[in-house]
Amino acid sequence: MRSSAKQEELVRAFKALLKEEKFSSQGEIVVALQEQGFDNINQSKVSRMLTKFGAVRTRNAKMEMVYCLPAELGVPTTSSPLKNLVLDIDYNDAVVVIHTSPGAAQLIARLLDSLGKAEGILGTIAGDDTIFTTPASGFSVKELYEAILELFEQEL
């Protein structure tokens, strides 16, 4: 089998496994892929694939922390349904705090990081459902707060 065909098959199998929402560790994903005949797979390859496809750890229906894929692959945009995952945006003298649906903070932070300094974002720190965002030089926290509100079309 051609290597690109084998790679496509690996990607399909990888995505199918993550859709099952039952793998809590990279090692479990490695074993599952090896059982499907992907003998060359190892933890570092799985780690790279998780990053490449934007996989996040979130709670499944059984409240277990598992790896899953976001609804949309690639860098999300503010026109995607991701803006519906933002529950609240607030700020203080130092940071803008964004509260999201459980498991959505990393996706929203990825969107904000992709916008970067041009929108006034120096960087983000994301947990499971909370994001801290700090303004870039030349931007106040209030200006960043207003820019983020505008991105997600929420009321002041």
From Swiss-Prot:
One of its GO terms (molecular function) is arginine binding. One of its GO terms (biological process) is L-arginine biosynthetic process. It holds the Pfam family Arg_repressor. Its main location: cytoplasm. The keyword rRNA processing does not apply. Keywords: Amino-acid biosynthesis, Arginine biosynthesis, Cytoplasm, DNA-binding, Repressor, Transcription, Transcription regulation. This is Arginine repressor.
